[in-house]
């Protein structure tokens, strides 16, 4: 597998737009040891040609620009993208807002839990993702999911989603919904990501609130 870290900053990126903490001043002053960073996201490929995004950050347009492997391929016609799927680990703004950058009627798959797909469905702004081109695929926890291209061909990557400590996205918190704002297991997940042969794997846990010893 080929793995690209598209962004590694927390919500809002680094530096955050309204932050005057000394750490945030460093990139503005050109400190080479504190470069600006975009919000967290990965790109993964089994063949180096077609790619899967793990979360779609608000900085996605810039992340695509900065990574030529995600550029439209010049021999594939007027419209093309190597991005064939997006996997969402929760409904945080930092992880779903970038979907709006992918609205140009380009075919790809969205993989997420039923809970997160419900959030997308309840917010009409995501209807800019034309369902004739963009398929929303529900994932069940603790079961392997083979990632597919829009035409149904395997991408050579299998994921295993499982619940981790966390909560519902900040913008969905409901103080009247009970403990932890009414959060359920499908609100925050982690992923074991494996190649098709099961020879290599890694874990992606961008919103895990705590880890046991």
Language model feature labels by segment:
Residues 1-204, 209-212:
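Binuclear metal-dependent hydrolase catalytic cores
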